[in-house]
A protein has these predicted regions:
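Short, solvent-exposed positions on alpha-helices
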Residues: 68, 88, 110-114
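TPR/TPR-like (Sel1-like) alpha-helical repeat modules
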Residues: 107-128
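N-terminal alpha-helical interaction modules that lie
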Residues: 1-82, 125-172
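Structural register within alpha-helical repeat arrays
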Residues: 57, 92, 97-99
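Solvent-exposed loop and edge beta-strand segments that line ligand/cofactor-binding
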Residues: 83-87
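Residue signature of alpha-solenoid helical repeat architecture, marking inter-repeat boundaries
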Residues: 48, 88-90
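Generic structural signal for well-ordered, non-membrane alpha-helices
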Residues: 68-75, 95-98, 117-121
Length: 173
């Protein structure tokens, strides 16, 4: 899922990637993240649009290696997503993947594997509950491809820092 020229493309990347235990949370670049958070409505109506700038920015942050920051933005989008909606399930999976990626950076492969496994459960839930085509995040996202990638990662004997997942690139493969 590449980022089109839009508001999301104009949002700056944080000045640094926050990593728990390496930097104090007060040192996270909250000023930059606030710009994206301000784009998230209090509630999305029926679905989260696949092209919503905060969603795209959260995905781009993950793919650029800003895992903690990605999780923060995606959690804000998740909180505004319709209750019980399919987007909440996919967003939860993406949040767990960003968290797993962060754990890999922190050299905690077992925790990363657990988060990848939890994300896979969410993706399997989506696969069982197919819906009609639309303009929502779920309909535009290749969940089956992402699930296959997670299964391959989890089948490895051990995960390393190099095993992090760029879920935005899944749609472009």
């Amino acid at each position: 899922m590449s980022m089109p020229p839009s508001i999301a493309a104009k949002l700056p990347l944080p000045q640094w990637a926050y990593v728990p235990g390496e930097t104090a949370e007060a040192e996270a670049d909250h000023d930059t993240l606030w710009q994206a958070m301000a784009l998230v409505p209090s509630r999305f109506q029926d679905f989260v649009p696949a092209r919503h700038p905060a969603l795209r920015y959260g995905i781009a942050l993950n793919d650029a290696g800003y895992f903690w920051e990605s999780q923060e933005i995606l959690e804000a989008v998740w909180a505004a997503a319709p209750q019980g909606g399919r987007e909440r399930i996919l967003l939860r999976a993406c949040i767990q993947i960003a968290n797993a990626n962060l754990r890999l950076r922190m050299q905690k492969p077992r925790a990363a594997a657990r988060y990848f496994g939890e994300a896979l459960v969410e993706l399997d839930t989506l696969g069982r509950n197919a819906a009609a085509a639309g303009d929502g995040f779920v309909e535009a996202f290749p969940t089956a491809r992402l699930a296959a990638l997670l299964k391959a990662k989890l089948a490895q004997p051990a995960l390393t820092k190099a095993d992090w997942v760029e879920f935005g690139k899944i749609g472009r493969a």
